[in-house]
Amino acid sequence: IRNFLFLFLFFSGIIFISIIFLPSLLLPQKITLFGGKLMGYWSQYCLKIILSTKIVVKGKDNMINDKKFFIACSHQSMFETFFLQTVFNSPVFILKKELTKIPVFGWYLKKIGSISIKRDKITRDNLNFFEDISETTQNSERPIVIFPQGTRVLPDDRPPFKKGASRIYEKLNIFCQPIAINSGYVWPKNGIKKTNKVITISILEPIKPGLQKEEFLQVLEKKIYDELDLVG
Protein backbone atom coordinates (compact mmCIF):
# COMPACT_ATOMS: atom_id res chain seq x y z
CA ILE A 1 0.00 0.00 0.00
CA ARG A 2 2.80 2.44 0.88
CA ASN A 3 4.53 1.64 -2.41
CA PHE A 4 1.36 2.46 -4.38
CA LEU A 5 0.76 5.59 -2.30
CA PHE A 6 4.33 6.77 -2.91
CA LEU A 7 4.07 6.33 -6.68
CA PHE A 8 0.65 7.96 -6.83
CA LEU A 9 1.56 11.03 -4.76
CA PHE A 10 5.04 11.42 -6.25
CA PHE A 11 3.89 11.42 -9.87
CA SER A 12 0.77 13.46 -9.06
CA GLY A 13 3.03 16.11 -7.55
CA ILE A 14 5.39 16.07 -10.51
CA ILE A 15 2.47 16.45 -12.94
CA PHE A 16 0.99 19.26 -10.83
CA ILE A 17 4.29 21.18 -10.76
CA SER A 18 4.71 20.63 -14.51
CA ILE A 19 1.27 22.11 -15.20
CA ILE A 20 1.76 25.07 -12.86
CA PHE A 21 5.10 25.90 -14.49
CA LEU A 22 3.94 25.54 -18.12
CA PRO A 23 3.90 29.35 -18.57
CA SER A 24 7.57 29.37 -17.53
CA LEU A 25 8.41 27.89 -20.93
CA LEU A 26 7.82 31.39 -22.29
CA LEU A 27 9.56 33.15 -19.41
CA PRO A 28 13.22 33.43 -18.30
CA GLN A 29 14.97 30.09 -17.82
CA LYS A 30 15.56 30.64 -14.09
CA ILE A 31 11.82 30.32 -13.44
CA THR A 32 11.69 26.91 -15.12
CA LEU A 33 14.78 25.85 -13.17
CA PHE A 34 13.01 26.78 -9.93
CA GLY A 35 10.27 24.33 -10.91
CA GLY A 36 12.94 21.64 -11.21
CA LYS A 37 14.12 22.39 -7.68
CA LEU A 38 10.56 22.05 -6.40
CA MET A 39 10.38 18.61 -8.00
CA GLY A 40 13.60 17.71 -6.21
CA TYR A 41 12.25 18.75 -2.83
CA TRP A 42 8.94 17.00 -3.52
CA SER A 43 10.71 13.71 -4.25
CA GLN A 44 12.57 13.91 -0.93
CA TYR A 45 9.38 14.78 0.93
CA CYS A 46 7.56 11.75 -0.51
CA LEU A 47 10.45 9.45 0.36
CA LYS A 48 10.66 10.70 3.94
CA ILE A 49 6.95 10.88 4.73
CA ILE A 50 5.56 7.88 2.84
CA LEU A 51 8.46 5.41 2.76
CA SER A 52 10.09 6.57 6.02
CA THR A 53 13.36 7.04 4.18
CA LYS A 54 16.26 8.72 5.95
CA ILE A 55 18.39 10.86 3.63
CA VAL A 56 21.98 11.43 4.76
CA VAL A 57 24.48 13.71 3.03
CA LYS A 58 28.19 13.07 3.68
CA GLY A 59 31.20 15.12 2.65
CA LYS A 60 29.67 18.58 2.32
CA ASP A 61 33.15 19.98 2.97
CA ASN A 62 34.24 18.43 -0.33
CA MET A 63 31.80 20.53 -2.36
CA ILE A 64 33.47 22.77 -4.92
CA ASN A 65 32.27 26.35 -4.57
CA ASP A 66 34.95 28.58 -6.03
CA LYS A 67 35.80 27.10 -9.44
CA LYS A 68 34.25 25.45 -12.46
CA PHE A 69 33.61 21.72 -12.22
CA PHE A 70 31.47 18.90 -13.53
CA ILE A 71 29.70 16.20 -11.54
CA ALA A 72 30.24 12.45 -12.03
CA CYS A 73 27.57 10.56 -10.11
CA SER A 74 26.63 6.93 -9.65
CA HIS A 75 23.20 6.10 -11.03
CA GLN A 76 20.82 3.62 -9.42
CA SER A 77 17.44 5.37 -9.62
CA MET A 78 15.45 8.46 -10.59
CA PHE A 79 16.40 9.95 -7.23
CA GLU A 80 19.74 11.31 -8.47
CA THR A 81 18.22 13.50 -11.17
CA PHE A 82 15.86 15.12 -8.68
CA PHE A 83 18.17 15.37 -5.68
CA LEU A 84 21.14 16.99 -7.43
CA GLN A 85 18.95 19.94 -8.41
CA THR A 86 18.44 20.79 -4.74
CA VAL A 87 22.12 20.74 -3.74
CA PHE A 88 23.95 22.22 -6.73
CA ASN A 89 23.28 25.26 -8.89
CA SER A 90 20.68 23.87 -11.31
CA PRO A 91 23.02 21.33 -12.93
CA VAL A 92 22.88 20.55 -16.65
CA PHE A 93 22.05 16.92 -17.42
CA ILE A 94 23.25 14.89 -20.38
CA LEU A 95 20.45 12.66 -21.62
CA LYS A 96 19.12 10.57 -24.48
CA LYS A 97 17.91 12.53 -27.51
CA GLU A 98 14.65 10.57 -27.48
CA LEU A 99 13.62 12.15 -24.15
CA THR A 100 13.49 15.63 -25.69
CA LYS A 101 10.79 14.44 -28.12
CA ILE A 102 8.29 13.57 -25.37
CA PRO A 103 5.45 16.14 -25.36
CA VAL A 104 5.62 18.69 -22.51
CA PHE A 105 8.44 16.79 -20.73
CA GLY A 106 10.71 17.30 -23.73
CA TRP A 107 9.84 20.98 -23.85
CA TYR A 108 11.04 21.38 -20.28
CA LEU A 109 14.27 19.50 -21.00
CA LYS A 110 15.06 21.85 -23.86
CA LYS A 111 14.10 24.94 -21.88
CA ILE A 112 16.45 24.14 -18.99
CA GLY A 113 19.37 23.61 -21.37
CA SER A 114 19.79 19.84 -21.16
CA ILE A 115 22.39 18.39 -23.53
CA SER A 116 21.07 15.50 -25.59
CA ILE A 117 22.84 12.77 -27.49
CA LYS A 118 21.56 10.00 -29.75
CA ARG A 119 23.01 6.74 -28.49
CA ASP A 120 24.65 4.16 -30.72
CA LYS A 121 24.47 6.33 -33.83
CA ILE A 122 26.99 8.61 -35.47
CA THR A 123 25.16 11.84 -36.24
CA ARG A 124 26.14 15.45 -36.77
CA ASP A 125 24.71 16.23 -33.33
CA ASN A 126 26.89 13.57 -31.73
CA LEU A 127 29.98 14.91 -33.44
CA ASN A 128 29.22 18.32 -31.92
CA PHE A 129 28.51 16.84 -28.48
CA PHE A 130 31.84 17.70 -26.85
CA GLU A 131 31.74 21.20 -28.30
CA ASP A 132 28.28 21.65 -26.77
CA ILE A 133 29.39 20.67 -23.27
CA SER A 134 32.51 22.80 -23.55
CA GLU A 135 30.46 25.83 -24.60
CA THR A 136 27.96 25.23 -21.78
CA THR A 137 30.75 25.06 -19.21
CA GLN A 138 32.44 28.22 -20.47
CA ASN A 139 29.26 30.30 -20.64
CA SER A 140 27.45 29.15 -17.50
CA GLU A 141 28.02 28.66 -13.79
CA ARG A 142 25.80 25.56 -13.85
CA PRO A 143 27.80 22.31 -13.54
CA ILE A 144 27.29 19.50 -16.04
CA VAL A 145 26.22 16.12 -14.63
CA ILE A 146 27.35 12.83 -16.12
CA PHE A 147 26.49 9.29 -15.08
CA PRO A 148 29.68 7.34 -15.94
CA GLN A 149 27.91 3.98 -15.57
CA GLY A 150 25.89 4.95 -18.62
CA THR A 151 22.50 3.90 -17.27
CA ARG A 152 20.74 2.98 -14.03
CA VAL A 153 22.23 -0.12 -12.42
CA LEU A 154 21.31 -2.40 -9.53
CA PRO A 155 22.84 -1.46 -6.15
CA ASP A 156 25.31 -4.36 -6.11
CA ASP A 157 26.32 -4.13 -9.77
CA ARG A 158 29.76 -2.69 -10.53
CA PRO A 159 30.00 -2.24 -14.31
CA PRO A 160 33.13 -0.53 -15.68
CA PHE A 161 32.70 3.18 -16.26
CA LYS A 162 32.15 4.39 -19.81
CA LYS A 163 35.12 5.91 -21.59
CA GLY A 164 33.02 8.92 -22.54
CA ALA A 165 33.44 10.18 -18.97
CA SER A 166 37.20 10.46 -19.42
CA ARG A 167 36.79 12.21 -22.76
CA ILE A 168 34.57 14.81 -21.09
CA TYR A 169 37.17 15.24 -18.32
CA GLU A 170 39.90 15.75 -20.93
CA LYS A 171 37.82 18.11 -23.05
CA LEU A 172 36.66 20.35 -20.20
CA ASN A 173 39.98 20.37 -18.30
CA ILE A 174 38.26 21.34 -15.04
CA PHE A 175 37.71 19.73 -11.63
CA CYS A 176 35.48 16.69 -11.31
CA GLN A 177 33.13 16.34 -8.31
CA PRO A 178 32.53 12.60 -7.74
CA ILE A 179 29.31 11.63 -5.98
CA ALA A 180 28.19 8.19 -4.78
CA ILE A 181 24.49 7.59 -4.05
CA ASN A 182 23.08 4.24 -2.95
CA SER A 183 19.47 5.09 -3.81
CA GLY A 184 18.83 1.74 -5.49
CA TYR A 185 18.24 0.08 -2.14
CA VAL A 186 15.17 2.29 -1.65
CA TRP A 187 14.13 3.20 -5.19
CA PRO A 188 15.28 0.34 -7.48
CA LYS A 189 15.04 0.79 -11.24
CA ASN A 190 12.67 -2.17 -11.32
CA GLY A 191 10.54 -3.49 -8.51
CA ILE A 192 8.92 -2.40 -5.29
CA LYS A 193 10.17 0.63 -3.37
CA LYS A 194 11.63 -0.20 0.05
CA THR A 195 10.56 1.34 3.37
CA ASN A 196 12.55 2.35 6.45
CA LYS A 197 15.87 2.50 4.60
CA VAL A 198 18.66 5.05 4.36
CA ILE A 199 19.81 6.83 1.20
CA THR A 200 23.38 8.05 1.61
CA ILE A 201 24.72 10.77 -0.66
CA SER A 202 28.52 10.89 -0.46
CA ILE A 203 30.14 14.00 -1.92
CA LEU A 204 33.68 12.80 -2.49
CA GLU A 205 37.00 14.62 -2.72
CA PRO A 206 37.34 16.41 -6.07
CA ILE A 207 39.61 15.12 -8.81
CA LYS A 208 41.92 17.79 -10.18
CA PRO A 209 42.32 18.36 -13.92
CA GLY A 210 45.46 17.18 -15.67
CA LEU A 211 45.35 13.41 -15.28
CA GLN A 212 45.62 11.10 -18.25
CA LYS A 213 42.23 9.86 -19.43
CA GLU A 214 42.86 6.27 -18.38
CA GLU A 215 44.14 7.29 -14.95
CA PHE A 216 41.18 9.60 -14.38
CA LEU A 217 38.70 6.84 -15.17
CA GLN A 218 40.44 4.44 -12.80
CA VAL A 219 40.55 7.01 -9.99
CA LEU A 220 36.91 7.99 -10.49
CA GLU A 221 35.66 4.42 -10.61
CA LYS A 222 37.62 3.43 -7.50
CA LYS A 223 36.42 6.46 -5.51
CA ILE A 224 32.76 5.88 -6.27
CA TYR A 225 32.70 2.08 -5.99
CA ASP A 226 34.78 2.08 -2.80
CA GLU A 227 32.31 4.50 -1.24
CA LEU A 228 29.29 2.49 -2.38
CA ASP A 229 30.87 -0.64 -0.88
CA LEU A 230 31.45 1.27 2.36
CA VAL A 231 27.95 2.70 2.82
CA GLY A 232 26.21 -0.46 1.57
PLM segments and residue spans:
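Non-catalytic C-terminal accessory region of glycerolipid acyltransferases
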Residues: L127-G232
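Short acidic-hydrophobic, aromatic-tinged amphipathic segments that line or gate anion-handling sites
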Residues: V57, I115-K118, P209
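Catalytic core of membrane glycerolipid acyltransferases/transacylases, capturing the structured
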Residues: I17-Q29, L33-K37, I49-I50, N65-I122
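Membrane-interfacial terminal anchoring regions of lipid-handling membrane enzymes
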Residues: I1-L26, F34-K37, D61-I64, T136, ...
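A generic structural signal for alpha->beta connector loops
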Residues: S52-K54, S90, K111, E141, ...
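A generic, lipid-embedded transmembrane alpha helix
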Residues: Y41-T53
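Short gly/ser/thr-rich secondary-structure transition/capping motifs
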Residues: I50-K58, N126-N128, N182-G184
